[in-house]
Amino acid sequence: MYLEEQNSDLNDEINDLICLSNDLTSLEDRLAVKLKAWNLIPEPKLNWVEPTSSVANGISGVYEEKGDYKVALEWVLLALKAREIEPDASIFCDAGAIYFELGDMENAYKYFQLAYNELRYQPFSYRDRKYWQFYKQRKEELNPKKKTKK
């Protein structure tokens, strides 16, 4: 379900807060505004594909920037849960990056693979190159290319 279809004014208010938060330079200020947007989402929050997934993913991103990967993971998993019926490759890639930073390479690869299957390289293009390098290397290790003889 999309909040915009049920209450477009509230959805616009939440979107305005997210846009405002993205313009702020202080991580603490960005987090405070994103949490304010989160608190405006009607309960049960996970019933709304949007704005729940984008707000939760945005909050996750702030925690990721702060280096608090455990909390970032909690939020990105909420974003994924809200998107169960409509997956989003960019959130898969974000989850992969967080798992990577937590040292959970199995889950990192799993989510990078989901992102790649959906949109190929595109979601990786917004992230540090190390995630793409990891994904390519792990994919090759798991599925070695057969060398052709000339």
What is the predicted role of each segment?
Residues 100-123:
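TPR/TPR-like (Sel1-like) alpha-helical repeat modules
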Residues 2-8, 39-50, 80-88, 122:
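Flexible helix-coil transition and linker loops at the boundaries of alpha-helical arrays
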Residues 25-28, 67, 103:
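Residue-level detector of the short coil/turn that links helix A to helix B
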Residues 12, 29, 47-51, 87, ...:
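Structural signature of alpha-solenoid helical repeat junctions
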Residues 35-42, 77, 113:
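Alpha-solenoid helical repeat scaffolds
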